[in-house]
C-alpha cells in the first residue's frame, strides 16, 4: 500500500487542526463559563435594582401622600384668628411700648450722630454700619434680640447635648 504525499499532508493538517482546536477550547470554555456567570450576575443585579427602586418609589409616594394629609389636617386646626387671641395682652402691650421706646432711641441717636458725626457707645447701644452711616441698635432689649437669644440658647443646648 502506497501512501501518497497528499494523504500524509491531510493527516498532518488534521492533527494540527484538532490539537489547536482542543488547546483553544481549554481557554475558551472556562472563559465562556465565567462570562456567562458575570452576565447572569448583571441580569440578577439589574432585576434587584429595579425591584428596590420600585419599592422605594412606592414607599416615597405613600409617605408623601400621608405627609400631605397630615399637613392639611394641621393647617385646618390652626387658624390665624385663634393665634392672635392666645397672645398675652399685657405682654403684647409691653412689647409695643418697648418697641416704640427703641424707635425713639434710634431716631435720637441717629440725629445726634448726623449732627455730631460721632456716636458715643453706651452699654446698651451697639453701632452697626449701614451704607456708611452708623446706626445704633439696642441689642439687649429689642424683640428681635430676644428671639435671637432664645435661638442661641437652643443652639448651645443642642451642642452641649451632642
Curated annotation (Swiss-Prot):
Entry keyword set: Membrane, Sporulation, Transmembrane, Transmembrane helix
Q: Which residues lie on this side of the membrane: Extracellular?
A: 23-26
Location in the cell reads: Membrane
Which residues are exposed on the Cytoplasmic face of the membrane?
Answer: 1, 48-162
Looking at the Swiss-Prot or TrEMBL record, what is one Pfam family this protein matches?
Answer: Osw5
The organism sits in which domain of life? Answer: Eukaryota
A single GO BP annotation from the record?
lipid droplet organization
Q: What does this protein do?
A: Involved in spore wall assembly.
Quote the protein name from its UniProt record: Outer spore wall protein 5
Source species: Vanderwaltozyma polyspora (strain ATCC 22028 / DSM 70294 / BCRC 21397 / CBS 2163 / NBRC 10782 / NRRL Y-8283 / UCD 57-17) (Kluyveromyces polysporus)
Q: Coding gene?
A: OSW5
Amino acid at each position: 500500500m502506497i501512501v501518497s504525499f497528499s494523504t500524509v499532508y491531510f493527516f498532518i493538517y488534521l492533527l494540527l487542526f484538532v490539537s489547536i482546536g482542543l488547546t483553544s477550547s481549554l481557554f475558551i470554555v472556562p472563559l465562556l463559563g465565567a462570562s456567562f456567570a458575570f452576565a447572569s450576575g448583571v441580569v440578577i443585579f439589574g432585576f434587584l435594582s429595579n425591584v428596590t427602586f420600585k419599592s422605594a418609589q412606592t414607599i416615597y409616594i405613600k409617605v408623601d401622600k400621608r405627609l400631605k394629609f397630615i399637613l392639611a389636617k394641621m393647617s385646618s386646626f390652626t387658624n390665624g384668628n385663634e393665634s392672635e387671641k392666645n397672645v398675652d395682652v399685657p405682654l403684647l402691650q409691653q412689647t409695643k411700648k418697648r418697641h416704640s421706646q427703641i424707635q425713639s432711641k434710634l431716631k435720637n441717636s441717629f440725629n445726634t450722630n448726623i449732627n455730631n458725626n460721632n456716636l458715643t457707645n453706651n452699654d446698651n447701644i451697639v453701632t452697626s454700619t449701614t451704607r456708611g452711616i452708623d446706626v445704633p441698635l439696642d441689642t439687649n432689649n429689642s424683640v428681635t434680640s430676644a428671639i435671637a437669644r432664645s435661638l442661641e440658647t437652643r443652639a448651645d443646648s443642642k451642642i452641649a447635648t451632642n
